[in-house]
Amino acid sequence: MDGAHENAAESSSSVPRSEEPACSAGGPEVLPPEESEGCAGSLDAAPKKLCGYLSKFGGKGPIRGWKSRWFFYDERKCHLYYSRTAQDANPLDSIDLSSAVFDCKADAEEGTFEIKTPSRIITLKAATKQVMLYWLQQLQTKRWEFHSSPPAPPAAPDAAPAGNGPTLRLELEQEEEELEDFLSPVRTPPGLVGAAAALQPVPTKPLALQNISLKHLGTEIQNTMYNIRSNRQAQGTGHGPPGEDPPLSAEPQRAEWPLPSDPGTPGKDPADSPKPTPKSSLTANLIQKAKRPNNTFPLFAEGLTRTRTAQEKILALEQQVLMLTKELKSQKELVRILHKALEAAQQEKRASSAYLAAAEDKDRLELVRHKVRQIAELGKRVEALERERESLAQTAGLREQQVQELQRHVQQLLEKNQAKQQVICKLSEKVTWDFTHPPTQPPVPLGAADRDFLSQQEKMEHLKDDMEAYRTQNRFLNSEIHQVTKIWRRVAEKEKALLMKCAYLQAKNCQVESKYLAGLRRLQEAAGGEATESSELLRQLTQEALQWEAGEASADGVELSPISEYDEYGFLTVPNYEMEDLKLLAKIQALEVHSHHLLAHEAVERPLRERWAALGDLAPSVELKQLLRAGVPREHRPRVWKWLVQLRVRHLQSPGHYQELLSRGQVREHPAARQIELDLNRTFPNNKHFTCPTSTFPDKLRRVLLAFSWQNPTIGYCQGLNRLAAIALLVLEEEESAFWCLVAIVETIMPADYYSKTLTSSQVDQRVLQDLLLEKLPRLMAHLGQYRVDLSFLTFNWFLVVFADSLISNILLRVWDAFLYEGTKYNEEEILRLQDSLEIYQYLRFFTKTICNSQKLMTIAFNDMNPFPMKQLRQLRRAHRERLEAELHELEQLKAEYLETQSSRGPAVPDGCTSEDEGEGEA
């Protein structure tokens, strides 16, 4: 069948004509087209087809062996089709070369090679070694042409810049050095490949059925019937005398024969395949086909009647016979099953009759006991048979190993025997030569040394042959590895380009959806609370948008990375709000974050990961500072945070210190334990690790906070420490590491008294923030002062928990990356548009949740708003601390004076005085 398809490869309507570039040396190169340009000038003018006869190993049972097949290549699909002869109308099957690799073994039979695809391994054999190498090189070339034919990804430039000339020449020189280890181009074997091979007689087998494909029997019958009809039509036209053969064309003329719609599935019913449409131009060739003994079933063809009606009747009868045969088999199987059921019923009936025939209960009980004993005996027998089966299986395994060893031994003996036969042949030739050419001197008998020398020389000849075979195999495998690697790189580039394109389109889709939701929100605000038809429609659209899940969009496989419910650290990507407006805002924010992540993945995150991977050991440096400001990838963040924490608490750490603090809590309860227990359930209610009942994070957080309470009795526990420790736990995952991270933040990074009872340093930082905002954002502060907005109501908690409750997780952790290394050192226009203090407070409360571009935030913080020199921060803190302490001291004095005045006045109601109520009562 492949043969038919091979000729069909010449048709422009089915398989396009395959081209075989051949060098002046007469063979194609194994190298890709761009590497074989040096041979381009000597290529033949006319392209050659890749087709010819090869032996394919296959079959089952007694007919398993080598079968002659006609192979031809389809350039459109990069498939290698094969049929029984070159004249068959439809191929038997095809081999997908786009994902295949080729192999030839030095110890295999001459001309044998393999095509390995992901689904199977096809073993083929050529007539000679030269033909095998030609096929392998041509298949490599065709595979490379198929992979290199599509245009390169847009990211790759079409031409190298002029400045890259030396680099390009160096790469070409390196490639030329690599090509020295490859096979040289093989000349085209005359008459064995190409269109001329179709004119050669088909290789025959001793048995007629040995060359038939039983796996594709329907296709074989279809090809046979087509050949018979074609032969009759050719004979009916009366071209020339019957005994005269028409002239043969240079190529089989079958350009008008269509191929099946899907050659990869040749096992379809013949009725489903397209019918051949012979033309008058094919008459001469069809007459020639009739002369050749290439029919699949010669005896079957002779027995057919002359009329088409008889053929159809025979086919119908054959199908009816097959149907009746299947029905007979099913009836026999049904009879067998019914027979077994009848036997079981009879046995049950006999047992029941015996049971009912018993006169007394004792007899019946004895029958039951007898059956129980039989069941027990049968169970023991089954166990014994099972043990026997296992022992037999072990014995069979040992026998199999012995058989394999004996087979290897027999193979060694056969090889030795072959070597001895070769020695005998050489010695016989030498004896014949000695008899025909008698020596002038008497022959000297061979000694032991001479015999050893001859045997060594013979071994050397064999080793040279083996070495040459392995050298050829090695060169071919080098070229195969080289080409497969280049194909893999090209496919990887294409895949990367497609993934980038998909991510870009998905990001654009998220942006469009976000704009749609934002538009709905603006329409809702414009509609107000009016109960109109349009407002009802807006409400329905909003509910549908909020209920829409990303999983529905990815059901058809279009969306590659849908918005998940939780992020990588367990935080909700879309927070749950009770108010519908806030739900809509949360959905818009989730879409914007997802869109930004997709757009920044290839352009920002991948280069950043590469820089972190190449960083090596961590050490304080400007480069590390820049990398921390750019953000730490998730896979590197635990290692980096541990190093940053250790850098700050190295002088405080000691082996077993954390366990010692935990043991103190087991001896007696800390006064802050009750408050810690109350705050555990309020820690990050939007994180699944702290809300799931089976999670271990709450227990870890409890132990970390209790240990810190014992570590720093001055502070003990303060609200807000639970969030700091929770962030450390989510990233570091280890209790002790999270504990030392909390110690580093409270005792080394933050100023003293930041978490004390008076929160002195926290209040100082609020005043420092006011000064910095007056310096950096004077318009904003003037606007806030106009409406008497106090930022400390919001920013106080931001600073106390280092934005743990304010920012989304991916931006929060980037802030912490820089915070742990550098210590304590957006939306202005939106705030300036607000003209009401209540609106400003509401906006400031939620605007941190709307920040989705971490890169923009870091740029504003470290570039636009810079500098924030630590010297200036210390001076501002010192000045405000002095003022705050003076104010607190003044308040303490006023409090003391007030208490002193109150104590000097005595009780509020002196003894002997009556109230107005009492006086009225007496009157």
From Swiss-Prot:
Residues 47-144 form the PH domain. The keyword Coiled coil applies. Interacts with activated RAC1 and CDH1. GO terms for cellular component: anchoring junction; cell junction; cytoplasmic vesicle. Residues 631-823 form the Rab-GAP TBC domain. Residues 914-923 have a biased composition (Acidic residues). Residues 1-39, 146-166, 232-289, 900-923 are annotated as: Disordered. Acts as a GTPase-activating protein for RAB7A. Signal effector acting as a linker between RAC1 and RAB7A, leading to RAB7A inactivation and subsequent inhibition of cadherin degradation and reduced cell-cell adhesion. This is TBC1 domain family member 2A. The gene is TBC1D2. Residues 308-486, 870-904 form a coiled coil. Residues 301-439 are annotated as: Interaction with RAC1. The modification N-acetylmethionine is found at M1. Residues 1-171 are annotated as: Interaction with CADH1. Keywords: Acetylation, Cell junction, Coiled coil, Cytoplasm, Cytoplasmic vesicle, GTPase activation, Phosphoprotein.
